[in-house]
Amino acid sequence: MIIPWQQLEPETLLNLIESFVLREGTDYGEDEKSLEQKVANIRHQLERGDVMLVWSELHESVNIVPKEMFHS
């Protein structure tokens, strides 16, 4: 199920994004980014609609996925 990120409390959204960034360990190449930069990057992707928050009933967890990977 898609979760509209705009409906979340700002602190909840921040916690979800931080958890995702720390869990994924995204590779940014030679220029390592700070946690704040990575969080801002994911937030911008949410705002642009490039990624979305998805609730998995099977895993009882929220994940951030590229919109192309989610088939509604």
Swiss-Prot record:
Record InterPro entries: UPF0270 (IPR010648), YehU-like_sf (IPR036685)
NCBIfam families assigned: PRK04966.1
Protein family membership: Belongs to the UPF0270 family.
Cross-referenced HAMAP family: UPF0270 (MF_00690)
Official protein name in the record: UPF0270 protein plu0398
